[in-house]
Amino acid sequence: MRRCAIAICMMAALAWPAVLVAGQGRQDDVRLDAPSPLAGAREIARRTQTPTTFDRMQRYVSGSGRQLAEQTVDIAQARFDVFVPRKPPPPRGYALLVWIPPQDAYRAPMDWMPTLEAHGMIYVSPREAGNEAIVFDRRMPLALHAAHGIAARYPVDPERVFVGGFSGGSRTALRVALAYPDVFRGALLNAGSDAIGSARLTAPPADLMRLFQTTVRLAYVTGAHDLPNRRADAASQRSMQEFCVQQVHRHSMGSRGHATPDRRAFQKVLAWLDAPLPPSDHATLETCRKGLSERVRADLAQVRGLLDGGDLVAAGMALGDADQRWGGLAAPESVELARRIATGLAETR
């Protein structure tokens, strides 16, 4: 059985009586007063930054005597738009879709409500989390607070918690899903995506990456005429294949451009996203993982060779490339090499 965040599992179990008094239907400007313990600045950085970047950050903070703010969002001031199905929750609890919009507010569209009702799925979208908001300080924490806060108020099935978004919100949703596969089971990526290993999207620590490979579904939903984002989707999907991600689905929305899914498209995509997860193809997965590990080792071996040969600058450049490309899969060796290079450069000054 797929792992889930302990806090969300506990809150889901404790929240069953809350459904008797919590609101149903569409609710605007809602306050959720149960902050996520996984939304602290350090934890987000650990999961989203490259290992060498996170190590430098930690050493800087330690050396300066400062401390990272544990929470960058005041949950008491945060507001959310929510839709709760009117029918009773399924036996294991409601499904949940956390939606990250590109604008400051996005209530559940009327076109989506029949599908949300049919799936027994709650919709929640944070306010003031649009493209102008800082990703790591506000957009990601609010998505985590939304998931945790809803699970504190309603019975939620931790195996059916999803994140999604449109345009820039979709890119943020992919970051959230990649960094938190222990919270989210899938992502609805609507007209916005990035490739793992690019400057925008870092592979998380190895244990989280392995979980992401097998338990997180990615549904790419983009208009047929939205050519820039179709190209971005193609690059993102190639990277998912390279990083051994098993559950990827592409859905093109007919003659539409840069737009959110209409009722029919939303229904089709959610049917795939919310279906039972099929068994993993272990043989194919292990073959892919072996090849991936070999490529990581080869890049790190190149860095070691340059470092042992005394070419610190070239070693640093090669390590920078490997650190960005492989992220958490290259740790802890990438961190050890970075420290050696930094020490060597300091000694030559």
Residue spans for each PLM region:
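Short beta-strand element of the alpha/beta-hydrolase
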Residues: 92-103
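The feature captures the conserved acid-bearing segment of alpha/beta-hydrolase catalytic domains
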Residues: 193-270
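Gly/Ser-rich "nucleophile elbow"/oxyanion-hole loop immediately N-terminal to the catalytic nucleophile
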Residues: 86-93, 135-167, 183
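Alpha/beta-hydrolase-fold serine-hydrolase catalytic core, especially in secreted/extracellular enzymes
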Residues: 25-37, 243-247, 264-349
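A domain-start/cap signature at the N-terminus of enzymes
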Residues: 20-94, 299, 303
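Primarily recognizes the serine-hydrolase "nucleophile elbow" in alpha/beta-hydrolase
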Residues: 159-212
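Bacterial N-terminal signal peptides
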Residues: 7-18
